[in-house]
Amino acid sequence: MAENAIKDVLKDVLKHTHSLGIFEMVKISGTGSSTEVETVDADKTVIFKGSMVNPVADFVDSTVGLSRMNVLDGYLKYPGFDSDVATVQVIKQSRNGVDVPTEVAFVDENGTDAHYRFMLADVVNAQLKEIKFKGADLDLSIVPSQKNLKDLAYFNGVLSAFESTFSPRTEDGKLYFYIGDAGGDRTKILINDAPNGQITHEFKWPLDVVLKILRLGDSAGIVMSINTKGLLQIKVSSGIGEYTYLLPAKG
């Protein structure tokens, strides 16, 4: 990868993890053919798995962790480090005879520098256990529109103080998102046609978190899928990475 290309990779990873405000750390593992990213929040509300479109040379045969992500995010957003003439590179050190990534070094054109330390592999592996997911059949998939996002955000603003979840259900060949329950304040929002899928169980997911994920990219690069066993999957493609968010239902 070109010099400073790591900056774009780190920005993209943080955008799709740290910006959601629910993940404490992220694990990055690489080989010569792939670079994988994964994490899960403390409550296991969202399981995150990502793969970079192109393998990242700095992480080949290595595993590192990102914690204190607000520090890394702050460095990446500093105008001096974000300029084309700044240098951003991964520094490696020898450990047990093997060169491993230990930090990211930032230097601007005036000589101002900053350093961000990675979590070592054994530390992140101990704190963020391997996330196993064998996959699942998905019964209904849609590409959310901008109108969907606006409608969901609007009614979330109206009802979130009283109801923080939503329930997707199909009715007469259409998919609706229900917020609130019978006997209280509620709304039913038309999302899309669903001629080939059927979701009738009243599974619930946190609307605020789902909205944050859906806002990560333009609607054309997002696919939302649901299965009848209570799994919501959102796939986001950024051009730099392909990211999958898995949300087990709450009820």
Describe each region flagged by the PLM.
Residues 1-116, 138-251:
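DNA polymerase processivity clamps
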Residues 112, 116-128, 132:
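Short, well-ordered, aromatic-rich surface patches in folded extracellular/luminal domains
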Residues 133-137:
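Alpha-helical phosphate/pyrophosphate-handling elements in metalloenzyme active cores
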